[in-house]
A protein has these predicted regions:
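Active-site bordering "gate/hinge" segments
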Residues: 1-286
Length: 286
């Protein structure tokens, strides 16, 4: 996405931690924990605001531009995401490229019409909305391209974003957005509770305040969000995680903070995105 400041912030934190570990009098583990806490706390408002904009602002079109504008018959387009690309993504894209156009259009229509039908069944006026939250697995771009076109015919622009990577925006090892096969699923699992290194009441409140401010800045965009349209996959090679004693875990107090933060985060979201005026669709492909 070209976010050089984010990269610079990470490099700065890395160098600070490296310096602590190189210095025999550097303070050890507690000094490292404090450095990480300070970095995450300082960057929290911007990280949360950036994520909020990703979720709502269609002008952030990094992924949508790949889907809509690249030559999908040239599988090198997959590497433009900057994500790990496995044989799963390559083989999926290659297979979809072999299908006739009418089949791909029908696959997309099943997805988009199911979304529209959800609004009809709920007696919700879709014409009031302008945005749809499109989530998918990398490799399905040919279907997603058709889906974006069909959503536009309904008056909806697709908002497409990467799964969250900043610690304050992640939800354990769950991935919401577009994503591919993990390079190391065990590593993702090991680090699902990293926020437990330093989560406290102040950090929880800092995130919630940042989220509320971000939604307030994008009140009109939030009001236009119709809800998620999710294209999932099944049949992947089974992953059996190993619980490692070295991995960070939450204390009972931190688990309570996490529960409060998730509850209050949902409440803030529903203040700006009316749950009674939204719907969703989920479809799964092998």
């Amino acid at each position: 996405e070209g976010r050089l400041k984010d990269m610079a912030d990470c490099c700065q934190t890395f160098l600070e931690v490296y310096g602590i570990l190189e210095d025999a009098q550097g303070g050890g583990a507690e000094a490292v924990r404090h450095a990480l806490y300070t970095a995450v706390s300082d960057l929290c408002p911007q990280a949360v605001d950036d994520r909020n904009r990703e979720l709502l602002d269609p002008s952030l079109s990094f992924a949508r531009d790949i889907v809509m504008n690249r030559d999908l018959t040239d599988l090198r387009y997959l590497y433009l995401y900057g994500d790990y690309i496995s044989d799963n993504e390559l083989d999926t894209a290659r297979y979809l490229n072999q299908l006739p156009q009418e089949t791909v259009t029908a696959m997309a229509a099943t997805f988009t019409e199911g979304y529209r039908r959800g609004f009809e069944l709920a007696h919700v006026d879709l014409s009031k909305k302008s945005l749809v939250d499109v989530r998918y697995c990398i490799g399905f771009e040919r279907v997603i391209r058709e889906a974006v076109k069909q959503f536009r015919q309904m008056g909806l622009e697709a908002v497409i974003y990467r799964f969250a990577v900043h610690l304050m925006n992640r939800r354990g090892s769950e991935k919401i957005g577009y994503y591919g096969t993990p390079a190391n699923a065990q590593c993702d699992y090991d680090h699902r509770c990293d926020l437990g290194l330093f989560l406290d009441h102040d950090l929880k409140q800092r995130k919630l305040d940042a989220q509320r401010n971000a939604y307030e800045r994008r009140r009109e965009l939030a009001a236009g969000m119709a809800g998620p349209a999710v294209m999932e996959i099944f049949g992947e090679e089974a992953f059996i995680p190993v619980n490692k004693p070295e991995a960070v875990s939450y204390t009972p107090y931190q688990l309570k903070l996490m529960s409060q933060m998730q509850r209050d985060s949902v409440r803030i979201t529903y203040q700006y995105i009316n749950g009674e005026e939204r719907s969703f669709a989920i479809i799964s492909y092998p």
